[in-house]
Amino acid sequence: MYKKTIDYDKVSKIYDNVRVGDPEMVTQILQGVSLENDSLVLDVGCGTGNNTILFTKATNAKVTGLDISYGMLEKASEKDKQVPLVQSPADTLPFSDETFHFVFMTEVIHHLPGPQSSVYDIFRVLETGGSLCIVTQSHTQIDGRMTSRFFPASARVDKERYPDTDVIEGFMLKSGFDRASSKEYQFRPTQLGEEYLNTARNRGYSMLHKISQEEYEQGLYALEAAFASGEKLTYSAGYTFVWGFK
């Protein structure tokens, strides 16, 4: 039941209706890295390019987006045809050794079939002195999600999918990074409204594709009932920024 795979070419058709780039997340990444005008940056698992484009606009660096899904990259290209896009899995990157100054991935590592091999190949394409930032959620942060309240099976599924932050640091050190560290960040509280409800209705969160139909319908019923009752749902998302330094 929890081994369902996700067809991201199909998901791409609704992805931009329910998911947008996150300036606050990109800002936190930028606070941890120093980039020059000609720095080469790689966004691994860029999806429809939301954060790739935000990162490009916020810096003068040359940012490339990479994703395994052609459908996602098609959407990204529609938004900005100037951003280079590459279709490839994350564990066999089609780049020469020591190409990039900085690599980042946002909410991607739990989608990778072989996260250790992907981190190793990222290490290969990073230049000496470069860094990697993996934005993810710890198991504690997963438990604190609003989706975990209404769809409790999704927390169980995601704690199986997400390597915890100490494990990710281990991936980095095993791959050859000189050091690794993690920094937790709590986003500003937001009141959840129709956008959140529509995201759940459209299964815009990937973990909702991995729970049973019965569990999904029960959770959606409870969520819609909470909105109908006038309950104010306020949520402050927690993320962990795991850094590796080469």
Placement of each model-derived feature along the sequence:
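Conserved class I S-adenosyl-L-methionine
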Residues: M1-E36, N50-L54, M72-K75, S131-R161
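A short glycine-rich, Lys/Arg-flanked "PGG" loop and its adjoining helix->strand segment in the class I
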Residues: Q116-T128
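A conserved beta-strand element that flanks and buttresses the S-adenosyl-L-methionine
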Residues: F104
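Class I SAM-dependent methyltransferase SAM/SAH-binding core
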Residues: L40-V44, T48-T92
